Amino acid sequence: MKKVVKILRGIGYLAAFSLILYPVVSNYINQMNSTTIATDYEQEVSHLSEEQENAMIKQAQDYNESLIGIGSIADPFSESNENQTEDDEYNKLLKIDDTGMMGYIDIPKLDVVLPVYHGTSEKVLQSGVGHLKNTSLPVGGESCHAVLSGHRGLANAKIFTDLNKMEVGDVFYIKVLHHTFAYQVDQILTVLPSDTDALQIEKGKDYVTLVTCTPYAVNTHRLLVRGTRIPYEEAQKIDEEVGLQCTIPFNLILLIGGIVALIIIWVSIKSHKRRKEKKHEQNN
């Protein structure tokens, strides 16, 4: 009987440790997959000729120009966006393969590299960041405002889970074909889903806004983190300054906390067992 109890206790420890490790391991695997996706994307881009790339950028710029003066913009998480994948003309823009990926976003502050896909259907948002149709494609330029949306709290990926940690002054990068565009956060808003005024194009401005649901797991509002275009070299300097600050990754904190919790549980069980044995000896 004692042997069975020990086996069950061991299984319990293993299950508890697995639950603690799951988010850490899951996020690590997701980050590795994202890095692989980015590498594969750049490999595909390397096969494009200069003429092909220039033509793709020109098509994207023409699309962006056609959006100037457009009316209202839909909520990125609206069910109406499910049909966006049926627009063949839109899906051909910046297309280099059949994945639907138009580029990727690198957010150093959040330690994530995420693929950016056409549209904001649920299928897209389960695997990466979605570009909101009828907003500018992320190729830079005056009078452009790209809107990129991502989920929070997915079991198998962070995506925009930590977007609330972004602060004014932080930088992020958009990689499209051979171009890298740098943006610095200049505005953070929390709005109702129907309030999309802050996503409109502003004459002469070059913006990218990152959108997710908030509060976490409640999702009644939208968190809008807007970045304005800055020179790449300037963004690199900001990154270097931030890099000098000593920060401990959240996953490491979670892992250490989990191990400490298990040790405390183990010590408590051992202490309880000793007291029980001692009491038994005294009674005898």
Model regions: which residues?
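Solvent-exposed, non-transmembrane regions of membrane-associated and secreted proteins
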Residues: 2-248
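C-terminal single-pass membrane-anchor helix
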Residues: 239-284
